[in-house]
C-alpha cells in the first residue's frame, strides 16, 4: 500500500526524497520504496522519519480500515 501520508508530509515540508534520506541516514531509494509501499521500514527508521517531518508515527504510518 502506498504511503501517501508520508509523501504529502515530505512535500509540505519542502523536502525532496534525497533531503529526507539525508536527514534520516538512508538512501533516496529507500525513501522512494517506503512511499511506494514496497519496503517496510524498521521502527527506528519510522521514528527518524516522523521526527524529521515533525509528525507522529500515527500521522504517517497508522492505517485506518477505510484507507
Predicted regions and their residues:
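Short basic helix-loop element that most often maps to the first helix and adjoining turn
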Residues: 4-23
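Short, Lys/Arg-enriched C-terminal cap helix and immediately downstream tail that follows
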Residues: 8, 43-44
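Short amphipathic helical patch at the helix-1/turn junction of helix-turn-helix
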Residues: 11, 39-40
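Key DNA-contact positions within bacterial/archaeal DNA-binding proteins
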Residues: 18, 29, 58
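Recognition helix of helix-turn-helix/homeodomain-like DNA-binding domains
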Residues: 26-39
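DNA major-groove recognition helix of helix-turn-helix/homeodomain DNA-binding modules
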Residues: 44-59
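Phosphate-coordinating loops and pocket residues in cytosolic domains that bind phosphorylated ligands
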Residues: 62
Amino acid at each position: 500500500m502506498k504511503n501517501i501520508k508520508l509523501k504529502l508530509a515530505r512535500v509540505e515540508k519542502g523536502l525532496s526524497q534525497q533531503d529526507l534520506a539525508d536527514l534520516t541516514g538512508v538512501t533516496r531509494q529507500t525513501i522512494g520504496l517506503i512511499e511506494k509501499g514496497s519496503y517496510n521500514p524498521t521502527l527506528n527508521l519510522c521514528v527518524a522519519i516522523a521526527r524529521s517531518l515533525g509528525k507522529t508515527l500515527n500521522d504517517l504510518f497508522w492505517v485506518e480500515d477505510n484507507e
